[in-house]
Amino acid sequence: MSKLFGKFFKNTSLLALVAAPGVVFAAPSTDPISTFGILGSYNDFKLEGGSESDKDHMPEAGLFYNFGNKLTAESGFIYQAGIEAKYGEKSDNKLKEGQADLNLGWRAALDARNFVDVIVGGGYTWTRYEPDTNGYDMKLTNKSPFAKAALGYNHQFDDMTLRVEAGARHTIDGRAKLKVDGVGSDSVDLKDRTNPYAEVSLLMNQKGDLPVMAGLYYTRTEYKLDDDSYVADNTKLKRDEYGFKVGIAF
């Protein structure tokens, strides 16, 4: 009887040793994922004109959706396409925004858990500001295509992935249109600007039935009229946006 038990334990121990590495080191899926969720941000605005400046701030909330393998791929070609919409209101001043972008890149493995990548891409932003002007229905609309470039780093844990990304978006041929009902409208070109951004994302519960993505981001945007007048040369609007995203991946 003791020989039978001894043989049984010997065989099961050998099986456990063979199977254990697959259990302990099993990597999360590298397939592309869809992520849908909510976002919120706090915006600091600073208008500079000559020797004067004015500051204001506004909160925003919205929705986002993206699809790709930027958070899941280990090495090789990576991509992600996304859209988002935001809305903010303060003291009857309204801010509406939309953005769509596409990221393409290449990722290299440093080791089994650490990866770096280079990303290029482009997109389009639309922003409408509706100030409370006591009687006038006024709309200021900005439309800007952009190109982007960034560096990224992924660290893979057992059941989640941390991503850090930093880069810049360069606006191209932006336009601003001011419309006042009952008065008229006018459009001006915006100068091409290079605006930095950074984001940190964490994809959790990757091996579970309901993975969750959470992240923080920062973006600086500068608007300046493309005109040779004294006013245009000395007037610009700076915006610092601090935000978060939380969503489910599927």
Where in this protein do the model-derived segments appear?
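Residues that define the transmembrane beta-barrel architecture of outer-membrane proteins
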Residues: 32-34, 55-61, 77, 94-100, ...
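Cleavable N-terminal export/targeting peptides
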Residues: 1-35, 249
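Membrane-embedded beta-strand positions of outer-membrane beta-barrel proteins
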Residues: 36-40, 75, 79-83, 118-122, ...
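Predominantly the C-terminal beta-signal and adjacent terminal strand-loop region
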Residues: 177, 187-250
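Short loop/turn motifs that connect adjacent beta-strands in outer-membrane beta-barrel proteins
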Residues: 26-33, 68-78, 108-116, 156-164, ...
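Transmembrane beta-strands of outer-membrane beta-barrel pores
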Residues: 40-46, 67, 83-89, 108, ...
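Outer-membrane beta-barrel translocator domains and adjoining extracellular loop/strand segments
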Residues: 46-54, 86-97, 128-140, 173-188, ...
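Short glycine/proline- and aromatic-enriched beta-strand/turn motifs that initiate or cap beta-hairpins
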Residues: 24-93, 247
